[in-house]
Amino acid sequence: MLHQVHRQEDKRFADHLELLKYGCKSVVQWFNDNCCRGFSYDAITICPTNELVKEYTERYVKENWHYCFDTYEAEYDGSLTDELPVEQNIQLGLCRIMFLWNGKQYKRGDFAMIESFSDDGIDVTMEKTGERIQVQRETWTLTNGTKYTQYPMCLACAITVHKAQGCTFDEVNIDRGNGFWMPGQLYVAMSRCRTPYGIHLVKPLKEK
């Protein structure tokens, strides 16, 4: 069951999100009319599938090769499940990242800039506060009991709707790809943003 999070102060926006949550197709045109068209390079992109996220990530790494990317592999002591807390292989460089989990000095959806790498962890500067912190790998227990260790972050270029849950953004791109295929996916994607004017629709929404 989807529960409303009151991150929107714009009542019209909140009311239309509520209708969208319950499958009202007539509100789709309202979002097309009131959200921005195109793409913002300053915003993260929410996608319906891992495949589309992978396309965005590969393009970002290729276009920004000068950020000196390297691949950081997860460590685990058993078999992996379909649902992982963060990706098994993360490409990171001297670039902007987003946290995917809550920690003592950061929370899910926070952005930061990577400053340096060391054996002790990754030094980042938090975007909102300017504070410099060191981030270590986190360890999770998967549903099958496997211990899974990885950095709790991703490149700040694209994430799936699933990974975006619980996040709040001032600005976001939404790429529907071939369509949001699960009930409530579009609602979750649209409701991550505080205002409709912070939403950039890569493609116009379609009624299904």
Report residues per predicted region:
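C-terminal accessory regions
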Residues: C95, F99-K208
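Conserved helicase motor core of P-loop NTPases
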Residues: M1-S116
